[in-house]
C-alpha cells in the first residue's frame, strides 16, 4: 500500500511489512515503521535494493532460488554484513484458485521444489555471509477455503521442524492468499444475505486460525502471515 497514512496506522498497530522493492522499503521508513519488521520478497531484487535492505537492517530476505541466495551472500560479504534469509519452498499443493494466481505447484516458477529444499539449506549453511532465519511458502491468492492452506502446512510443518533442529531457523512464513468473496460482497446491501448460510461459509480469520494453529503451535517457531 503506497498510502503513508495507512502504513503509519499499521505500524502503530504493531504490524510488520512484506515488501517487494526498495521503494516500498523507503515508504515503510517514511511512515515511521521499523525496517527490522520487513521481509523482502519478490523475484527481481536489484543489487542496490539488496544493499539498501542490508544497510537498513530488514528482518529477512525471502529467496526464490540458489543463484539469488549466492548473489545476496556476495553483496553481504562486500558490505561486511550477514544477510538474514528465508528460502521459499514450493510444496506442490493446488491452491484451488484461478490458474493465473496459483503459485504453489511445480508448474509455477516460484520457490524451490519440496524434495530439494533441505539440500539447498545445507548449501546455504556453508555461505558465510548468510544467516538462515526462516522458511517461507506462498501457495496462491484469492483462496476462499482453508483446505489448501491446511494441506500445505501439514506438508511443510515437519520440514520447518527439521530445519529448526538442524539450522536454527526461528520463523515459518505461511505467505498470504486469504481471498475476498467479491460476488457475495456485492450483495451485502441486503441485510438478509449476511444472516444466510452463504455468509457462514466465508473463510474468516477465525476459521483460518482454527485449522492452522493446532498444526503450528507444536513447532515453537515464530509464525508470519500476510493477511
Task: List PLM regions with ranges.
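N-terminal active-site wall of soluble small-molecule enzyme domains
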Residues: 1-58, 97
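Structured alpha-helical segments in the cores of large, soluble enzyme domains
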Residues: 28, 41, 90, 114-131, ...
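Structural preference for beta-strand elements that scaffold enzyme active sites
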Residues: 16, 35-39, 60, 82-88, ...
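Conserved, mostly hydrophobic/aromatic
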Residues: 21, 53, 72, 87, ...
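C-terminal active-site-proximal or functional interface alpha/beta core segments in diverse enzymes
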Residues: 144-227
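Conserved anion-binding
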Residues: 65-131
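Acidic (Asp/Glu)-rich catalytic clusters
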Residues: 10-12, 29-35, 54-55, 73-82, ...
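Active-site beta-loop-alpha junctions enriched in small/polar residues
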Residues: 1, 20-23, 43, 64-66, ...
Amino acid at each position: 500500500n503506497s498510502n503513508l497514512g495507512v502504513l503509519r496506522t499499521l505500524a502503530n498497530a504493531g504490524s510488520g511489512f512484506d515488501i517487494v522493492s526498495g521503494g516500498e522499503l523507503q515508504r515503510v521508513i517514511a511512515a515511521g515503521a521499523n525496517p527490522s519488521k520487513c521481509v523482502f520478497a519478490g523475484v527481481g531484487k536489484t543489487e542496490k535494493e539488496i544493499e539498501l535492505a542490508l544497510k537498513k537492517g530488514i528482518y529477512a530476505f525471502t529467496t526464490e532460488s540458489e543463484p539469488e541466495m549466492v548473489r545476496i551472500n556476495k553483496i553481504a560479504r562486500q558490505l561486511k554484513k550477514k544477510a538474514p534469509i528465508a528460502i521459499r519452498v514450493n510444496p506442490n499443493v493446488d491452491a484451488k484458485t484461478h490458474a493465473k494466481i496459483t503459485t504453489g505447484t511445480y508448474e509455477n516458477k516460484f520457490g524451490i521444489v519440496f524434495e530439494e529444499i533441505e539440500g539447498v539449506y545445507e548449501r546455504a549453511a556453508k555461505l558465510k555471509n548468510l544467516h538462515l532465519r526462516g522458511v517461507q511458502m506462498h501457495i496462491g491468492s484469492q483462496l476462499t477455503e482453508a483446505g489448501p492452506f491446511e494441506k500445505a502446512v501439514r506438508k511443510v510443518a515437519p520440514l520447518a521442524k527439521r530445519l529448526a533442529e538442524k539450522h536454527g531457523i526461528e520463523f515459518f512464513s505461511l505467505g498470504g492468499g486469504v481471498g475476498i468473496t467479491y460476488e457475495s460482497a456485492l450483495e451485502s446491501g441486503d441485510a438478509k444475505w449476511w444472516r444466510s448460510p452463504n455468509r457462514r461459509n466465508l473463510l474468516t480469520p477465525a476459521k483460518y486460525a482454527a485449522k492452522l494453529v493446532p498444526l503450528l503451535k507444536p513447532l515453537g517457531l515464530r509464525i508470519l502471515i500476510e493477511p
